[in-house]
Amino acid sequence: MTEAAAPAGELTALGTPLRSFRFGAAGEGNKQEGGARKFVQTAQQAEEYGFDTFFVPDHLGDQIGPIAALGALTQATEKIRLGTSVLANGFRHPVVLAKDLATIDVLSKGRLEVGVGAGWKQDEFLAAGLPYETPGIRLEKLDETLTILDVLLRGQECNFEGKYYQVRGIKGTPRPRQGPRPPICTGGGGPKMLRLAAKHADIISIVPVTTKNGKGLLSGITLEKTIEKVNLIRDAAGDRFADIELNWAITAIVITDDREKTAEMALSAIERGLHPDLEVDVKLSVEDILNSPYVAIGSFEEIAEQIRRVRQLTSMSYVGVFPTQMDAFAPVIPLLRDE
C-alpha cells in the first residue's frame, strides 16, 4: 500500500495528519512526446529526476497500450513505481485485468499502482464497437470491478455474483508482491464518482468535472471547488479518510519571476477560448488562477510554496504532472522531497 508518512504532530486545515509529498509523471508515448520509441526513455528520465511514480493512461488513440507498456517498464526501470492513470473499465473484464496487473506487480518487484476508472471517452467506445452505457451503469460496473479486484489482487479466491459480472471460484494468481495488495486508485470530479472512490480506493485523484465533450469545467480548477470535493470524500469515507492518499495533476506549469502578470495573461487566454481542454462556465480572477491547485506559476521556490499551501488546505499530497512538464517541474522536487 502507499505510505502514510506524516511530519509528527502536523495537521492539515481539515484536521488530518500531513502526508509526505509524492510526485508522479504520466506518459502516453504519443507523437507529441516523441512516440513509442521514446516512451521508455521518458519513464527512465522521470526516475532520474526523482519522480516517485510513472503513470500510463488508457485510450485508443495515438498512444501505446498500458498493459504492454508497463510490462516493458518493469524491466527498463529500477525504483520508480508504475501505475495506470487510469484504465477504462469497459475495455477489459476484471478477472483478465487482475491477472495482468498481478503479473506486472510481480515483474516489477512490487511497484504497481492500480488506477481504474469508469471510462468517459464516448467516441473511443463507439469506434471500437464497445457499449457505452449511461453514467449510472458505468459506475455500477466500476463498483463491481473494484470489488473483484480487491479480492483477486490479494491472491484470494473470488466468488462474486453481481449484476454485470459473475466470478466463480477464480483464485488471484500470480499473487502480487505487495501486501495485502497493490494500492488501488480511482477518482473524478463528480459527487457520485468521488463517493465510489471513497468506498474503494487507497488513492483518490481529484479532477475538474468533465463535460460530455471531454473538456474540464473552468469552475472546477478553483481552490474552493477542490476543497468542496475533499470534504465530500471525507464525509463519504468516514474513519477511512485518514488512510486515503489524495492526488491531483498540475495541468499548467510556467516558470517566471512575475506571477501576477503571467496569471493575467493565462486568464486572458482562457477567456478568449485559447485553452482547448477547458470549457468556460464562470468568470475567474487573477487570484483564482494563482490559488488554483491545477496551475503552477512562479519561481521554483514559489511553486513549492504554493504546493505546500495546497496540501495544508486540502490534504492533497500526491502531485502529478504531464511528461511535457517534467523538465520544468523537476527542480521543484528536491525542495519538497523530505516534507
Predicted regions and their residues:
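Active-site-adjacent structural elements that line small-molecule/cofactor binding pockets in enzymes
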Residues: 1-339
